[in-house]
């Protein structure tokens, strides 16, 4: 078949390709320019799954930023410094335009179909167009920068705007601002994601765009350069070099070889629309019609060939844009398509190739799988029928362990053959998270003349730039050790501490050496004058960890001159987490040096942590050499370059000897270049040394060991005399690294504790041993047990039938006569060498101490380990029992264990035990101490101590273990042995490369296989562990939905039912509780368990100490009996009760029980508990004593001492002298009551406690008769300040205004002087016999009265000295008020003054007590019930003229006769200063005592006016009595004068006009300023705690009742004109 045959087959081929490309694959789409309708939009979920895998991610590690900043960038310049000489950072993202424009199809004026690589490459450098990249703000917010590339961006970047259509070769995004910010100020890594634009996505569009992006070779370009250098944007500029050269570095990040292909779960996909990553054999040609190679045939070219039949319209519809891979050959050959390197993590990885099936008879297709470093295998291809003559060949690739490539071969039949391939793909080759591309960060250094060098060529002591700017000044600024020529000293290299006679490394000039251009100073070591074998080590500075996969190199020059009978090694020590690993990276051993400087470059691979270098030199006698090093440098590639390639094959395992862990302080000899082959050892071979069947204090014999080892690989020589008697001598079979495990012997058991013994210690170390080395091994033997014994007497002690030892202990508290019963100490295991006839210890595993006769079961003796051979190996201290033997000590005691140099024999039993009953418990061979009643000490490097006194409970101590500095401790010392000791020697298998540091060697393949923890399996790399994949069962979606729906419905039904049941139950309980609480009698027997919590204020304390709930004395409820009710308190009912079962009081104690209702708020519970805490902390005869509390059951109780006399106020009112009722009270009784309260206040003052409410209502009496004692009994106002919630209180607070000083209610200041003021008011209450202070004044009026300087007049018949105490307590300044010690002293003076105590009490003519007490009580809920206030009613005019005006009220001016004692009080009050206006008409006016004979008409009248109407707040309120009286006709003009006088005084009395009933009684500036114009401004202040109500008056409720405007009794007060101040 000729060329005509090919043309005949081409039209149906292209027609079929047109159909298949739209139906069989999802990677083809119609061209918008050609007219076909758009394909359906891609589903959103499908797009989301693929978008991440379609992106190209550039991730620059954060370490790059850190290293670039530390190595290259100077410190940030201040704004004032010049810009010249500084460094700048720039960045860009570049893509080739050719693959991107191919995706868009034919464009007007631009032709890419001819295969041109770029437009006009001969015109000069490749042109580029720069687009704006992302912003720093976006990067900082999203932690990454996403650049979306679509058709519009491609047209803008590669073609330009419509007015200037000019194709360029490179599309760039400017990232300079972003990179500059990140390198200077950023944190974390820099992530830039380039992905297809999502706008108007069509089926397959994003996949094609992603492939085009990858084919355009996206690369990230960074540059750091000095000002004036050429940059990425202007590489052609070559300025003149300045005096000081700066860095000019460029980085390119792009996908690295061999893993170039797209990583996603769809693998590689190539439809030949644009260049793919496939390789072709023979090479691909796009020009001409070669008959021997593959060729692209675009659809446009087929259209121009006019090969299709039919109308023109059909051509455009059936031939979409795109290309096909065609092959036309007549040769008998193979043509291959080769995929890039791939990886597969899925068993479903499949190869899919679309070919034309009509061409199949002319040739055949064969697929090959080519794994890395493995033989290839054929992939079976199975055809799948397609449309229009096309078929898809599919073959299973699977999951190869190594990277692989796939080759598709077309084998022609010899005749003219035609092959057409439309689609080549590797699908479903990854599961889970995509592994991502391997990005390489390539670095370069630009010279001033434009020469570009690799970064590794800079700072390598070799001048590559014409002017030498790649060396010298720039490199010398690197950190210490990076660039070292030793011209300025050691460059951070240090030497290990050496003795004075040891040779030292020196920095000096070496003369008479063939320098070959080398001049200057170097690091030198001379061995000429050293006769013995020695070594010297010098250590470099510490270097940071290199970047992962960086081409890190070490460059150095070295020289050996003279004869060196030894070797020189360069060791790299890596600082791993918790340990150090070292490996030899360079080694040389020679007899005679060449005296030439030699340059060496070493690759530093697999360094993942901080590291340092060590130069280790060893030489023997006869060495006369000089060793030198110079020009040592670490390549900058270590920290500024990422190769992106794996440095180790995935199936290779690290050599254990290369990862051997060494002690950095150890000067060990390198064994890398020892002559002779390295032996391949059998990992199952080991040498186990035992006691050879010997036991007791002496070691084995040669015959015993011959019998014990006759069937093993061991051959030992046993010492027969001297210190080596019983020591096994063994020759090392081969030079290698060995692990030596030493196990000390256990101690003997005691007579009474036969369950546990003290275990021997295990020590495992790693040592380098040479073939023929002699090891001396002493295996420790177990100490003898005390029981069982053949001696019948001793056996009876063992079984407990004989207690003679216990009897002696009971009588004498020690054991002497019947000594014995303690176990012997265990022997230590010694492994040592001989050096010049002197033993040198390698490993010593200590023996366990012997248990004592009566040893305790649980004892713990920590393991002790020594590694310093300069510590003396002494024997343990001996007492009655023997101490353990050490390394090189002497002893003369028979029962003490011997040291190794004395033969290490075990000690005998103590002499008394042998003499009394022959109880022998000897120590084990290896220095175990003999036992007595106490245990013997264990052997070791330092022997264990025995008890100094024969304590039958004191065990012997374990010995101290030892490991030589020549070895490495592999495991810590552990107590594990329960019998005789052992020594196990085997080849060391290093497992430090494994993730869990555990491994084993396969006996057949001799490969190291790592172990993994439970639940994990070994990964393919043979090192790391991964979670074993467990197939998750997939249930049907319908079943899952039905189960979830059913569960949800059931949960809702159960929840609703539960809520209804709980609600109904709670409702019933609440109803029952309400009925119970509303019942007349409360069932006190109903008790339930409960707890209460509170928090006290840490700023306050009681009596100088803090308080807590635990300080309260809890009284069991069963000991409390309630007798009768006493009344209602602040919280609940108060009962009289009895408490039985009190300590030191057999009779029941009478108490008062304060209760807290079960149903109460949390605030009430906290207040109740705080009051109990306060009262319980006081201990004074004048403060009510707290007997205890009962808080564990409901209702909660506070038990106080029973005060049968009641409260003081009620007592005074009930015992007032009346005309028909004389009283037994005298003035002295009132003074005694005042003295008692002052004593209690003094106690509170001394303990820094502020009561805040000293009033008669809060004081209680022990009894009403003679001998009464007054006590302070209520701390209600003190609760808040001593609770943490005091500072959180807001809103309305209740304050006892009439007992408070001005600074308290004006500024909220409470001190002990506050209680002094309150005590003065209390005195007024006592000597007025229970009257309310400030009679007839409301709280608001009291505020105005006190702040204006007014004070109360003395009560009737009040002695002058007593009133003087009151006035002193009422001083305006707190510091002028006396303390309670002075008050108590003055009261004592009053009790001794005859004029005071003989003063008669006034006779009461007012209403009886029963009438006064008929006042409304405080409701439980103050807000639930309006206060019972009496509204003022206008008096009838006819009643105004009925009653005459009382004489006492007609002339209250200066002409009025003052009551007795008033003169003294007035004098005291006048001494304080002039009375302000407004205080004169109400100051010192006492309405209660100005009416000695009240007219009986006051109690007559219709309705409610024939009895006084009073408002009394039992806690903080005030008395107000509205007493109707018959009015008399005042003299003409009297009333106007009174009103004028009141107005002139600035105060309107009750008769001046009614107040508004709805006004709130609050202290507001407007209220005071309106009524007190002459008061200074400093007195008009806000309260710091918000609104404050006085006397339970809430905002919006009426004030206290005031008199009617027509009340003559009150009007008469206003008729008198007071003189002005």
From Swiss-Prot:
Phosphorylated at tyrosine residues by autocatalysis, which activates kinase activity. In cells not stimulated by a ligand, receptor protein tyrosine phosphatase beta and zeta complex (PTPRB/PTPRZ1) dephosphorylates ALK at the sites in ALK that are undergoing autophosphorylation through autoactivation. Residues 1120-1396 form the Protein kinase domain. The keyword Coiled coil does not apply. Residues 1506-1518 have a biased composition (Polar residues). Residues 19-1042 are extracellular. Residues 1412-1556 are annotated as: Disordered. GO terms for molecular function: ATP binding; heparin binding; identical protein binding; protein tyrosine kinase activity; receptor signaling protein tyrosine kinase activator activity; transmembrane receptor protein tyrosine kinase activity. Disulfide bonds join 692-705, 787-798, 910-932, 991-999, 994-1010, 1012-1025. InterPro entries: ALK/LTK-like_GRD, ConA-like_dom_sf, Kinase-like_dom_sf, LDL_receptor-like_sf, LDrepeatLR_classA_rpt, MAM_dom, Prot_kinase_dom, Protein_kinase_ATP_BS. The modification Phosphotyrosine is found at residues 1082, 1096, 1100, 1135, 1282, 1516. Keywords: ATP-binding, Cell membrane, Disulfide bond, Glycoprotein, Kinase, Membrane, Nucleotide-binding, Phosphoprotein, Receptor, Repeat, Signal, Transferase, Transmembrane, Transmembrane helix, Tyrosine-protein kinase. It comes from the Eukaryota. SUPFAM superfamilies: Concanavalin A-like lectins/glucanases, LDL receptor-like module, Protein kinase-like (PK-like). Residues 1441-1461 have a biased composition (Low complexity). Disruption phenotype: Mice display a decrease in newborn neurons and defects in brain function. Mice show an age-dependent increase in basal hippocampal progenitor proliferation and alterations in behavioral tests. Mice lacking both Alk and Ltk show a strong reduction in newborn neurons. Mutants develop a thin phenotype at the age of 5 weeks, persisting into adulthood with reduced body adiposity, elevated adiponectin levels and improved glucose homeostasis, while having unaltered food intake and activity. It is a single-pass type I membrane protein. Glycans are attached at residues 174, 248, 289, 328, 415, 428, 449, 567, 575, 631, 673, 713, 812, 868, 890, 990. Residues 48-70 are annotated as: Heparin-binding region. Induction: In the hypothalamus, expression is induced in response to feeding. It catalyses: L-tyrosyl-[protein] + ATP = O-phospho-L-tyrosyl-[protein] + ADP + H(+). Residues 268-431, 482-640 form the MAM domain. Mainly expressed in central nervous system (CNS) and other parts of the brain such as the paraventricular nucleus (PVN) of the hypothalamus. Expression is also found in peripheral nervous systems, eye, nasal epithelium, olfactory nerve, tongue, skin, tissue surrounding the esophagus, stomach, midgut, as well as testis and ovary. The EGF-like region drives the cytokine specificity for ALKAL2. Homodimer; homodimerizes following heparin- and ligand-binding. Interacts with CBL, IRS1, PIK3R1 and PLCG1. Interacts with FRS2 and SHC1. Interacts with PTN and MDK. This is ALK tyrosine kinase receptor. The lineage of its organism: Eukaryota, Metazoa, Chordata, Craniata, Vertebrata. The gene is Alk.
């Amino acid at each position: 078949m000729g060329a005509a045959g090919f043309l005949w087959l081409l039209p149906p081929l292209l027609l079929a390709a047109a159909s298949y490309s739209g139906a069989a694959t999802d990677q083809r789409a119609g061209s918008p320019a050609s007219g076909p309708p758009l394909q359906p939009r891609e589903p959103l979920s499908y797009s989301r799954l693929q978008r991440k895998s379609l992106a190209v991610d550039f991730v620059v590690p954060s370490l790059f930023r850190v290293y670039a900043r530390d190595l290259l960038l100077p410190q940030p310049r201040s704004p004032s410094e010049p810009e010249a000489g500084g460094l700048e950072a720039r960045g860009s993202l570049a893509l080739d335009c050719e693959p991107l424009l191919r995706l868009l199809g034919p464009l007007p004026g631009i032709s890419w179909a001819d295969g041109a690589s770029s437009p006009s490459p001969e015109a000069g450098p490749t042109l580029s167009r720069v687009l704006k990249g992302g912003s720093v703000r976006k990067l900082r917010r999203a932690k990454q920068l996403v650049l979306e590339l679509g058709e519009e961006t491609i047209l803008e970047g590669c073609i330009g705007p419509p007015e200037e259509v000019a194709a360029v070769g490179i599309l760039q995004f400017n990232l300079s601002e972003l990179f500059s910010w990140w390198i200077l100020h950023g944190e974390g890594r820099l992530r830039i994601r380039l992905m297809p634009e999502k706008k108007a996505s069509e089926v397959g569009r994003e996949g094609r765009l992603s492939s085009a992006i990858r084919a355009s070779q996206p690369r990230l370009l960074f540059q750091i350069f000095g000002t004036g250098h050429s940059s990425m944007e202007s590489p052609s500029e070559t300025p003149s070099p300045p005096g000081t050269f700066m860095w000019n570095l460029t980085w390119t990040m792009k996908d690295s070889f061999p893993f170039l292909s797209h990583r996603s779960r769809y693998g590689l996909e190539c439809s030949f629309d644009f260049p793919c990553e496939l390789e072709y054999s023979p090479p691909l040609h796009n020009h001409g019609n070669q008959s021997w190679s593959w060729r692209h045939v675009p659809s446009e070219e087929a259209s121009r060939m006019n090969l299709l039949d039919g109308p023109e319209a059909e051509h455009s519809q059936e031939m979409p844009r795109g290309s096909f891979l065609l092959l036309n050959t007549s040769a008998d050959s193979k043509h291959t398509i080769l995929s890039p390197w791939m990886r597969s993590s899925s068993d479903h990885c499949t190869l899919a190739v679309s070919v034309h099936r009509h061409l199949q008879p002319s040739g055949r297709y064969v697929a090959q799988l080519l794994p890395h470093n493995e033989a290839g295998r054929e992939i079976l291809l199975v055809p799948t029928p397609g449309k229009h003559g096309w078929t898809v060949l599919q073959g299973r690739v699977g999951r190869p362990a190594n990277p692989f490539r796939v080759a598709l071969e077309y084998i022609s039949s010899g005749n003219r053959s035609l092959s057409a391939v439309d689609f080549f793909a590797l699908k479903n080759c990854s599961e889970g998270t995509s592994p991502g591309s391997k990005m390489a960060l390539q670095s370069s250094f630009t010279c001033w003349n434009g020469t570009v060098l690799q970064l590794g060529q800079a700072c390598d002591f070799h001048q590559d730039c014409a002017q030498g700017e790649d060396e010298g000044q720039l490199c010398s600024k690197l950190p210490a050790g990076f660039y070292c020529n030793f011209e300025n000293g050691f460059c951070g290299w240090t030497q290990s501490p050496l003795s004075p006679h040891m040779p030292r490394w020196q920095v000096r000039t070496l003369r008479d050496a063939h320098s070959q251009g080398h001049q200057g100073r170097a690091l030198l070591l001379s061995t000429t004058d050293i006769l013995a074998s020695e070594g010297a080590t010098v250590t470099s500075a510490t270097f940071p960890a290199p970047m992962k996969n960086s081409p890190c190199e070490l460059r150095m020059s070295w020289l050996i001159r003279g004869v060196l009978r030894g070797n020189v090694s360069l060791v790299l020590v890596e600082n791993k987490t918790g340990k150090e690993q070292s490996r030899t990276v360079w080694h040389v051993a020679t007899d005679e040096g060449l005296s030439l400087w030699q340059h060496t470059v070493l690759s530093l691979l697999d360094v993942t942590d901080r590291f340092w270098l060590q130069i280790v030199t060893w030489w023997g006698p006869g060495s006369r050499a000089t060793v030198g090093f110079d020009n040592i440098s670490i390549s900058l590639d270590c920290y500024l370059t990422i190769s992106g390639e794996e440095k180790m094959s995935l199936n290779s395992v690290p050599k254990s000897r290369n990862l051997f862990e060494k002690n950095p302080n150890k000067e060990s000899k390198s064994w890398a270049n020892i002559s002779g082959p390295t032996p391949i050892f059998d990992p199952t071979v080991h040498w186990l040394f035992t006691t050879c069947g010997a036991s007791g204090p002496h070691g084995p014999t040669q015959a015993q060991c011959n019998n014990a080892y006759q069937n093993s690989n061991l051959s030992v020589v046993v010492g027969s005399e001297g210190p080596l008697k019983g020591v096994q001598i063994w020759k090392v079979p081969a030079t290698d690294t060995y692990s030596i495990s030493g196990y000390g012997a256990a101690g003997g058991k005691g007579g009474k504790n036969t369950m546990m013994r003290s275990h021997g210690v295990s020590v495992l170390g790693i040592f380098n041993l040479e073939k023929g080395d002699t090891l001396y091994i002493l295996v420790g033997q177990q100490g003898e047990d005390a029981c069982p014994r053949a001696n019948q007497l001793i056996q009876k002690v063992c079984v407990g039938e004989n207690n003679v030892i216990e009897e002696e202990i009971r009588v004498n508290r020690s054991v002497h006569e019947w000594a014995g019963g303690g176990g012997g100490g265990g022997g230590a295991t010694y492994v040592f060498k001989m050096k010049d006839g002197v033993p040198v210890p390698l490993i010593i595993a200590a023996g366990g101490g012997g248990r004592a006769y009566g040893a305790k079961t649980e004892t713990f003796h920590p393991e002790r380990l020594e590694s310093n051979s300069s510590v003396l190996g002494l024997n343990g201290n001996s007492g009655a029992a023997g101490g353990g033997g050490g390394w090189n000590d002497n002893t003369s005691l028979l029962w003490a264990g011997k040291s190794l140099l004395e033969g290490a024999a075990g000690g005998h039993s103590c002499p008394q035990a042998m003499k009394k009953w022959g109880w022998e418990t000897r120590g084990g061979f290896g220095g175990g101490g003999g036992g007595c009643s106490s245990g013997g000490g264990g052997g070791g490097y330092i022997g264990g101590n025995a008890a100094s006194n024969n304590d039958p409970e004191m065990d012997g101590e374990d010995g101290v273990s030892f490991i030589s500095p020549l070895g490495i401790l592999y495991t810590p010392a552990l107590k594990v042995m329960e019998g005789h000791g052992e020594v196990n020697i085997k080849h060391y298998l290093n497992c430090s490369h494994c993730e869990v540091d555990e491994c084993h060697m396969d006996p057949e393949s001799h490969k190291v296989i790592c172990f993994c923890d439970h639940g994990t399996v070994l990964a393919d790399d043979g090192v790391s562990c991964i979670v074993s994949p467990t197939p998750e069962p997939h249930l049907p979606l319908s079943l899952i939905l039905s189960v979830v729906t059913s569960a949800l419905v059931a949960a809702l039904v159960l929840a609703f039912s539960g809520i209804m049941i709980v609600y109904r139950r709670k409702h019933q309980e609440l109803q029952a509780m309400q009925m119970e609480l509303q019942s007349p009698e409360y069932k006190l027997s109903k008790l339930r368990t409960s707890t209460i919590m509170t928090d006290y204020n840490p700023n306050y304390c009681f009596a100088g100490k803090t308080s807590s709930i635990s300080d309260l004395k809890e009284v069991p409820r069963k000991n409390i009996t309630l007798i009768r009710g006493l009344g209602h308190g602040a919280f609940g009912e108060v009962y009289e009760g009895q408490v039985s079962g009190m300590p030191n009081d057999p009779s029941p104690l009478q108490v008062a029980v304060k209760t807290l209702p079960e149903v109460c708020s949390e605030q009430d519970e906290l207040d109740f508990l705080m009051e109990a805490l306060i009262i319980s902390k006081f201990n004074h005869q004048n403060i009510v004593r707290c007997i205890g509390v009962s808080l564990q059951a409901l209702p909660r109780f506070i038990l106080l001492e029973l005060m049968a006399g009641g409260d003081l106020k009620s007592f005074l009112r009930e015992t007032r002298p009346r005309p028909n009722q004389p009283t037994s009270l005298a003035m002295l009784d009132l003074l005694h009551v005042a003295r008692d309260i002052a004593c209690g206040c003094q106690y509170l003052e001394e303990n820094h406690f502020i009561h805040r409410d000293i009033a008669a209502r809060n004081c209680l009496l022990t009894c009403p008769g003679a001998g009464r004692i007054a006590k302070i009994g209520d701390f209600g106002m003190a609760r808040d300040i001593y609770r943490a919630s005091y500072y959180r209180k807001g809103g309305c607070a209740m304050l006892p205004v009439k007992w408070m000083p001005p600074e308290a209610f004006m500024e909220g200041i409470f001190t002990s002087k506050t209680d002094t003021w309150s005590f003065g008011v209390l005195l007024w209450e006592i000597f007025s016999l229970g009257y309310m202070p400030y009679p007839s004044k409301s709280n608001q009026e009291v505020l105005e009265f006190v702040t204006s300087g007014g004070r109360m007049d003395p009560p009737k018949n009040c002695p002058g000295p007593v009133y003087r105490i009151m006035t002193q307590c009422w001083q305006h300044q707190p510091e002028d008020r006396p303390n309670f010690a002075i008050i108590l002293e003055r009261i004592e003076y009053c009790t001794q003054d005859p004029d005071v105590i003989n003063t008669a009490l006034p006779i009461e003519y007012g209403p009886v007590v029963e009438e006064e007490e008929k006042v409304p009580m405080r409701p439980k809920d103050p807000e639930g019930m309006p206060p019972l206030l009496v509204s003022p009613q206008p008096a009838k005019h006819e009643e105004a003229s009925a009653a005459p005006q009382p004489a006492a009220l007609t002339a209250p001016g200066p002409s009025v006769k003052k009551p007795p004692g008033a003169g003294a009080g007035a004098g005291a009050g006048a001494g304080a200063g002039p009375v302000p206006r407004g205080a004169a008409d109400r100051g010192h006016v006492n309405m209660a005592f100005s009416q000695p004979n009240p007219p009986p008409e006051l109690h007559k009248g219709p309705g409610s006016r024939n009895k006084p109407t009073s408002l009394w707040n039992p806690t903080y309120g005030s008395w107000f009595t509205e007493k109707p009286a018959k009015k008399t006709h005042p003299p003409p003009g009297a009333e106007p004068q009174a009103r004028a006088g009141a107005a002139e005084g600035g105060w309107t009395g009750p008769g001046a006009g009614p107040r508004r009933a709805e006004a709130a009684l609050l202290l507001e500036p407007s209220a005071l300023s309106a009524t007190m114009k002459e008061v200074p401004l400093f007195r008009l202040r806000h309260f710091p705690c918000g609104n404050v109500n006085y006397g339970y008056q809430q905002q919006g409720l009426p004030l206290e009742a005031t008199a009617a405007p027509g009340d003559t009794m009150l009007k008469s007060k206003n008729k008198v004109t007071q003189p002005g101040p």
